[in-house]
Amino acid sequence: MTNTALPTSSADQENDTQLNELHKSQNAVVLLSGGLDSVTCLYWAKARYASVTAVSFDYGQRHNSELIAAKAIAETAGVNHRIIDIDIAQLGGSSLTDHSMIVPDGDTDKFPDKKRDEIDNDAIPNTYVPARNTIFLSYALAVAEVTDSNHIVIGVSSVDYSGYPDCRPEYIAAFQHMANLATKAGVTGHHLSIQTPLQQLSKAKTIELGLSLGVDYGQTISCYQADANGFACGVCDSCALRRQGFAQAGVADPTHYQS
């Protein structure tokens, strides 16, 4: 697992340079939802790896206009793109897949001092999709094996988050350990890593990173209940974090809002 920590010595800088050179000969799989974080990860991976495959999921989400965004983003970036069908919606348990449930309004101040290791059940919103990241990463792991990729890139963060347990560093570390125990690649010495370049970045810092890499955030859809045209509701948790991020970064928000 990796983060965005900077090297602290000349030896660290030399090791970092050698690692970057190694990565340029390797391939990566990027989980691409069509949102702000995942497109930043896509461009981050493009700058580091020889070949990148983007993977998106049609899982019965109410905001499936994000898949249209993901397709356009992948085409703009010039990367291979796979959309995988998984019917998670039949399981229920989330307002993102169950239309009888209400998507709550966002509140960026609801966890001002709470760290990820202090998350409790009351802090997990109903937009959490049961086991979603585990399911997505498992499919990405299979794609990594068939595309001879050493890395899977996912846009989880420990700074700006919605209280999801499957975005924590310890979860990512555990999945990476499992991946190297449970795959042909892992047991034959081809180490698989889960890369989390946004893990320690706020939404504002993520936006700054993306802009430095050439990301067009006008293509992205973050909203949990975007309409068929991709217009965002402006009030859900994801919209609240996105609005806050652009404001803190001092950058104009290119999002099309419903009102």
Curated annotation (Swiss-Prot):
Matches recorded under InterPro entries: QueC, Rossmann-like_a/b/a_fold
Cofactor note: Binds 1 zinc ion per subunit.
Enzyme Commission code: 6.3.4.20
One example of a Gene Ontology biological process annotation: queuosine biosynthetic process
SUPFAM superfamilies the UniProt entry points to: Adenine nucleotide alpha hydrolases-like
Protein's name in the database: 7-cyano-7-deazaguanine synthase
Family named by the database record: Belongs to the QueC family.
Gene: queC
Obligatory cofactor(s): Zn(2+)
Residues given in the record as Zn(2+) binding sites: 223, 233, 236, 239
GO molecular function: ATP binding; ligase activity, forming carbon-nitrogen bonds; zinc ion binding
Originating organism: Psychrobacter arcticus (strain DSM 17307 / VKM B-2377 / 273-4)
Enzyme class: ligase
Residues binding ATP: 32-42
Upper taxonomic lineage: Bacteria, Pseudomonadati, Pseudomonadota, Gammaproteobacteria, Moraxellales
Listed pathway(s): Purine metabolism; 7-cyano-7-deazaguanine biosynthesis
UniProt keyword terms in alphabetical order: ATP-binding, Ligase, Metal-binding, Nucleotide-binding, Queuosine biosynthesis, Zinc
Catalytic activity: 7-carboxy-7-deazaguanine + NH4(+) + ATP = 7-cyano-7-deazaguanine + ADP + phosphate + H2O + H(+)
Keyword Zinc attributed: yes
Pfam families: QueC
Known role: Catalyzes the ATP-dependent conversion of 7-carboxy-7-deazaguanine (CDG) to 7-cyano-7-deazaguanine (preQ(0)).
